[in-house]
Amino acid sequence: MNTIFTIILTITILVLSLILKDLLFEGRIKKINKLIPGPSTIPVFGNLLQINAKDFPKSVNDFYERYGKVFRLRLGSVEIVVLTGPEVIDECFNKKHREIFKERYIKFSRFLGKDYNIFSSNGDYHYVLRGILTSEITTRKLNNGRLESNKFILEMFSNLCKDNKETLVKNTPNQIRILAVKLILNFTLGIEENDETILIIVEKIKCIFEAAGLLIYSDYLPFLFPLDIKSMSKNDIISSYFFIKDFIGIKLDAIKIKYEKENELKNETTDETSSKLNNIPIIENYYKNYLDGSIHYDSILFSISDIIFAAVDSTSNGFSLLIGQLINKPEIQDKIYEEIMRNDENNNTNNISFADHTKYPYIISVMNESYRYNSSVPITEPNKTTEDVEVNGYKIAKGTMIIKNLRGTHLSKEFWGEDALEFKPERFKNQPLNQKGLFHFGAGARACPGGRFTESFTFTFLVIMLKNFKIVNPTDIPIDVEGEVGLAMQCKPFDALFIKRN
């Protein structure tokens, strides 16, 4: 009884102290940012209680519609400025203020990997980790078969459809996830796992991304950590994360033994061996950098985890949402098929590579519109200002958390006109991939380093799939293409009828 009383008394004193601090003390960041428009706050919690914990992006976008392209929030003890719109984001992250906005804001829940992974590290070390990945997904390497997309895509259709004229594919988004896991495990670890392990990994990644998209209260008020731990345990997010990390650790142990036995890095290599080294899985390149003293050992595990999580979930969900759009709008499928056939004089489409994408302008417009309409990440991981800066007439203090509102940026009528909520590829007619105004891979120095992977996967899959199949809705109910909130938007399950073309 005395213990319970002590805990209650301690919490009460802590809360009262925070209220007094909030009312009586005005820190530098708060003093500067208070002139930026935004909703009124309450002591200690700020605007935290005004946020929908299950749909943080919607809450942010609702505030944008009320307060404009630059507005202020205070969630708990954290000062936040939200930016919306192509011009504002471009100015801050790509142009005038690029250097000021390039650091990642490390939230409480990301603290574990802050010095070790691509996602949350800062400074020169971040660019070392990032550089190892980007060196492996250059356009040249992707075009030369660095990804074995075609092989895995054709295997998927062969297994699902066999020799049937029509095949009902149950839970199509899950089949896309399975394909993405197979591809990314081959790309990062150089392995082809059995189906049982693949299905477990699919479920673990899905669990992590669904739960991680929910509001984590201790990111803004650390004393609420016990509440979040209870929620995370219920959602199995912690056990799922460590399952993936341990899985990678086993593969890394095998690589360590291999290098110790063969001592490959100390021997002169023939041209043939050099060629093989250029195509080794990414985890081996991280391990080589560890042996050179460039990175920590734990950075291999954390970075490969980052790559697998991001590539599988955002890529597969984005593509599944696109399939849903194509089912709802069969006329777009027809136009894509016509373009494929115009370019397929030698009946060689199944061997297509990303190098061919410029020959398919309509497919590029469909991809651009998909990136706009179905932003895989509606609210990006936050950055922070490294010095005071003026944006859109408002002064933002050094150390402020910066959030990019991609849902509003990509779907607001203010930027895209009255038809902003329509899926309309023609708005990107004759424009290149990654058209100006799209920030689906983020922006600036911290833009997603795996963007080319997603583009290559999407283009290759789209061409092979629609060359060989027409995709039809087996019911009269349109596919739900809005997605559910997660760290990346989650495509809801749907069935699709794949009809072989002649």
From Swiss-Prot:
Heme binds at C448. Disulfide bonds: none annotated. It is a single-pass membrane protein. Keywords: Heme, Iron, Membrane, Metal-binding, Monooxygenase, Oxidoreductase, Transmembrane, Transmembrane helix. Gene3D superfamilies: Cytochrome P450. Its cofactor is heme. The chain crosses the membrane at residues 4-24. GO terms for cellular component: membrane. CDD domains: CYP1_2-like. It comes from the Eukaryota. GO terms for molecular function: heme binding; iron ion binding; monooxygenase activity; oxidoreductase activity, acting on paired donors, with incorporation or reduction of molecular oxygen. InterPro entries: Cyt_P450, Cyt_P450_CS, Cyt_P450_E_grp-I, Cyt_P450_sf. Its EC number is 1.14.-.-. It is an enzyme of class 1 (oxidoreductase). It is found in: Membrane. Belongs to the cytochrome P450 family. This is Probable cytochrome P450 514A4. It comes from Dictyostelium discoideum (Social amoeba). The lineage of its organism: Eukaryota, Amoebozoa, Evosea, Eumycetozoa, Dictyostelia. The gene is cyp514A4.
